Amino acid sequence: MADPAGTDEGEGTGCNGWFFVEAVVSRRTGDPVSEDENEDDCDRGEDMVDFINDTDILNIQAETETAQALFHAQEEQTHKEAVQVLKRKYASSPLSSVSLCVNNNISPRLKAICIENKNTAAKRRLFELPDSGYGNSEVEIQQIQQVEGHDTVEQCSMGSGDSITSSSDERHDETPTRDIIQILKCSNANAAMLAKFKELFGISFTELIRPFKSDKSTCTDWCVAAFGIAPSVAESLKTLIKPYCLYIHIQCLSCSWGMVILALLRFKCAKNRTTIEKLLSKLLCISAASMLIQPPKLRSTPAALYWFKTAMSNISEVDGETPEWIQRQTVLQHSFNDAIFDLSEMVQWAYDNDFIDDSDIAYKYAQLAETNSNACAFLKSNSQAKIVKDCATMCRHYKRAEKREMTMSQWIKRRCEKVDDDGDWRDIVRFLRYQQVDFVAFLSALKNFLHGVPKKNCILIYGAPNTGKSLFGMSLMHFLQGAIISYVNSKSHFWLQPLYDAKIAMLDDATSPCWAYIDQYLRNALDGNPISLDVKHKALVQLKCPPLLITSNINAGKDDRWPYLHSRVVVFTFHNEFPFDKNGNPVYGLNDKNWKSFFSRTWCRLNLHEEEDKENDGDAFPAFKCVSGQNTRTLRD
């Protein structure tokens, strides 16, 4: 048979072989027992401790414990790396803080030298990260900034025990310029200057100014607070800045920072904040960061009273005429005048200046607030939009009624009075002759046209393009303030509404569809007879159609498509192209001055006679007044 596995017949040392047992007999039976020996030792089995060999079992346990320790060490290393990544992501480096602190305090010049752009702006985070509880245990940064009356302390300490400290005794030996530089290093230099200003002057700087966000906004009046000025420079400021200003109000106080100046300046021309910063930095020898520059409050009575009262005291140096906005709010007479707003005065102003548009009235009247007490009261009102709308509405009513009361002769005379200069009527005559128009026939047609003679109420200027038809007609409409209608709006029911308020009207560049519309709907309008117009927000209005001037490239007076218009239009043909000189200017001046001269010269030929019955003042239509008159009280003996 085969030998059993693992058995070696030659030697008995295998696991299945024979064992050699050697017994050592230390004491035989019957030997006497010594007194020093303990009889119970044999019973404890101490001599059998190493009887069983457990070396292999201990080796296996050691290997298991080593593997567990290695796994634990690897897990601990992994966790440390994860925590370190989070610290690098959310916590600042202590070494960088230390280097920044050391550089800022030891070498400010080294701090100014930088090759790369450093963006120190704070990032906006959606959620605020909670404190992890892990601080900079190896290196600690402590920055203490204390701003008090005379002491300024900045401390930067590290965990190793090194520190850089500035004592109060050293601060007293430094110049005021150094003190103000240290103050400006605070996190909010503007707040520090505002606090120091209120401490010195007893009033907040923001109560005296109205802030301008843009540095490019211009203004003539500016309020300036400057800090850290040398005493000699502060005393000479009034003399240095006088050539640039119309009004100077300067207050000067001293503190631990140096001299502090509060100035109200009115410059000779409007300036922006950037220009003033450059000027004052040059005159006061300080940086722009140590100045507060804003325009003053112009409509604040407490602010005006502050400037008014301090100007009379001995703490201020004043030169020049007091600004009107201070006088208006401090002098008793101006206060009474600003109390009540009168709408009729505003309407009278708009009527006299021919303002009928809401925007023009609001803008122009607001500009009068500095000189007109009623305009100032208008700006103080909370219903400016309603006032402007009511003013424009009333002005249009007065203008419309006045125009209806005037005859054509009176209207032309009124328009001539609006033109100041006298022109040359010959330019218009030369232009008509250049276009081969009989001047006598034109005067006869113009006379019937202005008087609205039936069948002669419409003049057609016909000709090729670029012959000056529109220029001739538009210049006449501009002088007589006529209305313009356009066929492009013919789909609307109200496209003829401008005829409602017009003394004369014009339709430019009539085409075939336009002539077809006129032939179908406006024959009686060309006759000069009463027509019915659809006007917005009103019932149908009946009125006599004003004289109508039409320009066209189609001769409707001879076109067979519209035979009923042949007797209703008076046609003048322009044959030649409008001439210009080498500079591109018109050879013939068709403007208001020449039209004024033309009507003055042909006044009798056009049968434009004035009314014989005039008022007592010698004028058929005296100046319109919508304000109540002031009664004059006489003194009696």
Swiss-Prot record:
Extent of motif Nuclear export signal: 106-115
Domain of life according to the entry: Viruses
Domain SF3 helicase residues, every copy: 437-587
Residues annotated for ATP binding in this entry: 463-470
Matches recorded under Pfam families: PPV_E1_C (PF00519), PPV_E1_DBD (PF20450), PPV_E1_N (PF00524)
PROSITE patterns according to UniProt: SF3_HELICASE_1
InterPro entries tied to this protein: Helicase_SF3_DNA-vir, P-loop_NTPase, PPV_DNA_helicase_E1_C, PPV_DNA_helicase_E1_N, PPV_E1_DBD, PPV_E1_DBD_sf, Rep_E1_papillomaV, Znf_lg_T-Ag_D1_dom_sf
Chain spans, region DNA-binding region: 172-338
Reactions catalysed, as given in the entry: Couples ATP hydrolysis with the unwinding of duplex DNA by translocating in the 3'-5' direction; ATP + H2O = ADP + phosphate + H(+)
Positions of crosslink type Glycyl lysine isopeptide (Lys-Gly) (interchain with G-Cter in SUMO): 544
Phosphoserine modification, residue list: 93, 97, 107
Gene Ontology biological-process annotations: DNA replication
Coiled-coil ranges from the UniProt annotation: none
UniProt keyword list: ATP-binding, DNA replication, DNA-binding, Early protein, Helicase, Host nucleus, Hydrolase, Isomerase, Isopeptide bond, Nucleotide-binding, Phosphoprotein, Ubl conjugation
EC number: 5.6.2.4
Cellular location(s): Host nucleus
Main location: host cell
GO CC field: host cell nucleus
Keyword presence, DNA damage: no
Entry GO MF terms: ATP binding; ATP hydrolysis activity; DNA binding; DNA helicase activity
Motif (Nuclear localization signal): 87-89
Quaternary assembly: Can form hexamers. Interacts with E2 protein; this interaction increases E1 DNA binding specificity. Interacts with host DNA polymerase subunit POLA2. Interacts with host single stranded DNA-binding protein RPA1. Interacts with host TOP1; this interaction stimulates the enzymatic activity of TOP1.
Function recorded in the entry: ATP-dependent DNA 3'-5' helicase required for initiation of viral DNA replication. It forms a complex with the viral E2 protein. The E1-E2 complex binds to the replication origin which contains binding sites for both proteins. During the initial step, a dimer of E1 interacts with a dimer of protein E2 leading to a complex that binds the viral origin of replication with high specificity. Then, a second dimer of E1 displaces the E2 dimer in an ATP-dependent manner to form the E1 tetramer.
Family according to the record: Belongs to the papillomaviridae E1 protein family.
Protein name: Replication protein E1
Originating organism: Human papillomavirus 35
Designated gene of the protein: E1
